[in-house]
Regions:
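Short acidic-glycine-tyrosine-enriched beta hairpin
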Residues: 74-89
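A cytosolic small-molecule/anion-sensing beta-strand core signal
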Residues: 64-65, 80-81, 99
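Ligand-binding loop in jelly-roll beta-barrel domains
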Residues: 89-110
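A short, N-terminal "cap"/entry segment at the start of jelly-roll beta-barrel domains
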Residues: 1-36, 71
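Short, conserved beta-strand element in jelly-roll/cupin
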Residues: 43-45, 56-70
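Conserved short histidine dyad/triad with adjacent acidic residue
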Residues: 25, 35-55
Length: 110
């Protein structure tokens, strides 16, 4: 990652920030954080689950690699590369990786 003098953040290869995802693990790396946004890159090993939970903030999930089963309240979807999901605050949701998954979480914190 590099930051210019104007405080722009440029990440040439976002997926490269999470590598070597060990079996039976979920890894995360904060890419960006300010008063209004938190960007976190997740890597899931196949079969790993982020159990049902809620967030106090609206959020966006952008799936970059792999396939996952995603539950959003009563709705279930099959996520694949390119899947983009907006979730309102307090929506129960969970993610189960079917394959190795890389996903960008954008939490809208203001």
């Amino acid at each position: 990652m590099s930051e210019s003098l104007t405080a722009n953040l440029i990440v040439p290869d976002l997926q490269a920030l999470v590598t070597d995802i060990a079996a039976e693990s979920i890894v995360s790396r904060t890419v960006y954080k300010d008063d209004g946004l938190r960007a976190i890159l997740f890597g899931f090993a196949p079969g790993e689950t982020l159990s049902e939970h809620t967030s106090s903030f609206p959020a966006i999930l952008h799936f970059l690699e792999g396939e996952a089963a995603v539950t959003l309240g009563a709705e279930s979807i099959a996520a694949q590369p390119g899947t983009w999901v907006h979730m309102p605050a307090h929506l129960p949701h969970s993610i189960e990786a079917q394959t190795t998954v890389k996903m960008l979480l954008l939490m809208l914190t203001s």
